[in-house]
């Protein structure tokens, strides 16, 4: 059975989801029926075809009136600001992938269901009252048929949660800190401009900019036992894609660098294959652009202090890796039943 999806919001993640679907060869499993985006159709088609981070899309793209043609496929374009007015029932939508970055509450999810969708997957963290928050590879197997409003967490949560789980099971985590070194995002100005967050009034290309992050809360959402045991900070850096995460954890078992790297390498080749990758090469951020993994462990940067303090550096393409997990979670939601 082919899952019929709609994409609500055709920005960085929405376009990456569509491109990832075509590039990953999963069109027999998932079909994009419609896209709802307030921007004009000509701009939607242009930005799908030409992308500053991911290059030119390999499929032929053209737009006519309210239709987007991708290869031989026809996708309906909608420009409806009110979720309750979307024609999901008429179009037979199984799952809405809400990539707007605006919606994320249970009420928002229920509005999509009222419009006729069977299930909703938010491409960002949602409220505590959602049916589930999924980090694919860690807890997607817990999805049930009555989980109709689901969050796919965040790109950074998807990156770091598998590593935390692996280190905790092997060595027993007592507490930890996380520093996210994140590429610039579209909530930052090209030149100085007004913003509620005074640090984000500054030009994105000119500074390393500390910003707020809810990553610690995201860790606790997946692993409640770590409540008040993790803290996180985040800085934005003048690159347009790819993020690095510096994870430090104190553990109960004595350990050395070789043991940590062996554990993570084994997981990348085994239980987390396709989700976690592992590199021993002297790479830089641009080398991980367009990488579909949630996390890539840089073993050259693993450190252990006093046998009980572990520091790891983990890379991710915060757009492409997350977009691929959106597709994985969509299929997992479908497998759990409607």
Curated annotation (Swiss-Prot):
Principal location: cytoplasm
Site (Activates thiol group during catalysis): give the residues.
182
E.C. number(s) listed in UniProt: 1.2.1.72
Q: Which InterPro entries match?
A: E4P_DH_bac (IPR006422), GlycerAld/Erythrose_P_DH (IPR020831), GlycerAld_3-P_DH_AS (IPR020830), GlycerAld_3-P_DH_cat (IPR020829), GlycerAld_3-P_DH_NAD(P)-bd (IPR020828), NAD(P)-bd_dom_sf (IPR036291)
Report one GO cellular component: cytoplasm
Question: Which residues are named in the active-site annotation?
Answer: 155
State the UniProt keywords alphabetically: Cytoplasm, NAD, Oxidoreductase, Pyridoxine biosynthesis
Binding-site list for NAD(+): 12-13, 318
Tell me where in or outside the cell this protein is found: Cytoplasm
**Gene Ontology MF terms:** erythrose-4-phosphate dehydrogenase activity; NAD binding
Judged by the first EC level, this protein's enzyme class is oxidoreductase
Q: Which residues bind substrate?
A: 154-156, 200, 213-214, 236
The record's family statement is: Belongs to the glyceraldehyde-3-phosphate dehydrogenase family. Epd subfamily.
Record's function text = Catalyzes the NAD-dependent conversion of D-erythrose 4-phosphate to 4-phosphoerythronate.
The record's subunit annotation is: Homotetramer.
What name appears for this protein in its UniProt entry? D-erythrose-4-phosphate dehydrogenase
Top-level taxonomy:
Bacteria, Pseudomonadati, Pseudomonadota, Gammaproteobacteria, Enterobacterales
């Amino acid at each position: 059975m082919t899952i019929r999806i709609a994409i609500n919001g055709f920005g960085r993640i929405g376009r990456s989801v569509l491109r990832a679907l075509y590039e990953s060869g999963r069109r027999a499993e998932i079909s994009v029926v419609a896209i709802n985006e307030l921007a004009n159709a000509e701009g939607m088609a242009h930005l799908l075809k030409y992308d500053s981070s991911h290059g030119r899309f390999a499929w032929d793209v053209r737009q006519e009136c309210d239709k987007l043609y991708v290869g031989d496929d026809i996708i309906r374009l909608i420009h409806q600001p009110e979720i309750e007015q979307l024609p999901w029932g008429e179009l037979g939508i199984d799952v809405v992938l809400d990539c707007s970055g605006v919606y994320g509450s249970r009420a928002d999810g229920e509005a999509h269901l009222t419009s006729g969708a069977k299930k909703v997957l938010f491409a960002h963290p949602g409220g505590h009252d959602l049916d589930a928050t999924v980090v694919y590879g860690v807890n997607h197997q817990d999805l049930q048929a009555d989980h109709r409003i689901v969050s796919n967490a965040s790109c950074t949560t998807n990156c770091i949660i598998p590593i935390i789980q692996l280190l905790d099971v092997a060595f027993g985590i007592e507490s930890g800190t996380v520093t996210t070194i994140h590429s610039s995002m579209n909530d930052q100005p090209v030149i100085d401009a007004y913003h509620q967050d005074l640090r984000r009034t500054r030009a994105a290309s000119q500074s390393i900019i500390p910003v707020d992050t809810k990553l610690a809360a995201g860790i606790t959402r997946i692993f409640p036992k770590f409540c008040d045991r993790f803290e996180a900070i985040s800085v934005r850096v003048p690159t347009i894609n790819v993020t690095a995460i510096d994870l430090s954890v104190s553990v109960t078992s004595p350990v050395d660098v070789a043991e940590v790297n062996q554990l993570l390498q084994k997981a990348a080749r085994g239980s987390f294959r396709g989700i976690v990758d592992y590199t021993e090469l002297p790479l830089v951020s641009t080398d991980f652009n367009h990488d579909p993994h949630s996390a890539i462990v840089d073993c050259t940067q693993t450190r252990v202090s006093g046998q009980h303090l572990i520091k790891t550096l983990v890379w991710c393409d915060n757009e492409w890796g997350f977009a691929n997990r959106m597709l994985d979670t969509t299929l997992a939601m479908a497998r759990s039943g409607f």
